[in-house]
């Protein structure tokens, strides 16, 4: 073994450990979860509310593609999802926005006026989109 080989090996190990550190520390994940919570049995109004909520979330295509917004319909009758009733103090179908940073919930808000607007699709969409925008504005700014 030449005198240079131990230093080359040490340098290689240092580079590998630095690269592993970079790979292990991804940029902070920040996004808004748009939830529509429902039961198994649903009326036409509940089905409309889910469709309108999904449509409102879909209007944020750039944010969705960037992973900054997610839509999920959740059946509260499913055993694995029952905890949401307690988490968000739910009594019936609801639209809830959850702002998440680094895999932790930073804040959430129930949109109680969704029920008042569900009979008027354009007002429902405007209401939900405005509330989603407010949550997106609160996310940490992306690094350039």
State what each model feature region is.
Residues 1-11:
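Bacterial N-terminal signal peptides that target proteins for export
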Residues 18-28:
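Bacterial Sec-dependent signal peptides at the C-terminal "C-region" and cleavage site
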Residues 97-141:
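Non-catalytic, surface beta->alpha helical segment in thiol-disulfide oxidoreductase systems
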Residues 65-80:
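Thiol-based oxidoreductase modules, predominantly thioredoxin-like and allied folds used
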Residues 28-59:
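Local sequence-structure signature of Cys/Sec-based thiol-disulfide redox active-site neighborhoods
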Residues 82-91:
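Charged, often glycine-rich, active-site loop that binds/positions anionic groups
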Residues 9-19:
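Bacterial N-terminal signal peptides
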Residues 57-67:
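Signal peptide-proximal N-terminal region
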């Amino acid at each position: 073994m030449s005198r240079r080989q131990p230093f080359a090996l040490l340098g290689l190990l240092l580079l590998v450990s630095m690269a592993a550190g970079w790979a292990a520390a991804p940029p902070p994940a920040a996004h808004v979860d748009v939830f529509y919570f429902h039961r198994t049995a649903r009326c036409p109004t509940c089905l409309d509310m889910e469709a309108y909520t999904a449509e409102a979330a879909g209007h944020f295509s750039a944010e969705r593609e960037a992973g900054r917004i997610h839509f999920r319909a959740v059946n509260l009758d499913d055993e694995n999802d029952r905890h949401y009733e307690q988490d968000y103090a739910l009594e019936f179908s609801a639209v809830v926005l959850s702002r998440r940073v680094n895999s932790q919930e930073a804040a959430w808000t129930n949109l109680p006026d969704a029920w008042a607007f569900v009979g008027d699709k354009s007002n429902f969409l405007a209401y939900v989109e405005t509330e989603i925008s407010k949550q997106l504005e609160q996310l940490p700014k992306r690094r350039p």
